[in-house]
C-alpha cells in the first residue's frame, strides 16, 4: 500500500515498530469483495457520509445557536442572515438530514430484500435497526430546535405520545418535557439529546455495526 520511499523513512519505521502499520493497511486493503456487490450495497456508506455532514454542519451551528425559548428562533435567523455562509451550512444540514433518512430506509430495504439479516448476521441487523431508531430521533429532536410554531407544536405532540402507555406513561411525558408543560426545560433537554446523547449513541452503534460487517463480510446473493 505504501511506496518504498515512505516505508524507508524513519517516521514510518518508528510507527511500524510500535503499531505494525503495514499489517493493518494490508488487512484493510486486501479484504475480499464478492462479485455480486453493486451500487445498492453503497447505501449504508452514503448514510454514513450524510451523518458526517450532519455532525460537521451541526457542530458549526452550535457556535451561534442559543437554546432558549426567547432566543432560539432569533439565533437561527442570525445564522441564516448574518453569519458568513450560515444559510448554506444550515441548508446543507437540513438537506443531508433528509438524505440520511432516505438512504437509511433504502439501505434497510436492500438488506431485507437480499436476506442480509439472516444467520449469522442477526446482531448486525439488530444494531442497524437501533441506528434507524436513533436516526428518526435525530429528526424529531432537531425539528424542535428553531422553536418556531412548527417546532413547538411538534414537540408538544411528540412528547405527549408516551402518555398512552399504561402505568409509566405520565412519568415518561414529564421526563421528556422536564415538567408538566412544554417550555424552556423541554427545549434544553431536546437540545442536549440532539447534540450530545444521540451523536454518541450513533457513533458507538456505527462502530459495532462496522466491526461486525468487517468480521462477517458482506452477505452473499440470494
Swiss-Prot record:
The chain crosses the membrane at residues 39-59, 97-117, 123-143, 193-213. Its main location: membrane. Its cofactor is heme b; heme c. Heme b 2 binds at residues 93, 194. It is found in: Cellular thylakoid membrane. Heme b 1 binds at residues 107, 209. Keywords: Electron transport, Heme, Iron, Membrane, Metal-binding, Photosynthesis, Thylakoid, Transmembrane, Transmembrane helix, Transport. Binds 2 heme b groups non-covalently with two histidine residues as axial ligands. Heme c binds at residue 42. GO terms for molecular function: electron transporter, transferring electrons within cytochrome b6/f complex of photosystem II activity; metal ion binding; oxidoreductase activity. Component of the cytochrome b6-f complex, which mediates electron transfer between photosystem II (PSII) and photosystem I (PSI), cyclic electron flow around PSI, and state transitions. Heme 1 (or BH or b566) is high-potential and absorbs at about 566 nm, and heme 2 (or BL or b562) is low-potential and absorbs at about 562 nm. Belongs to the cytochrome b family. PetB subfamily. PANTHER family: CYTOCHROME B. This is Cytochrome b6. The gene is petB.
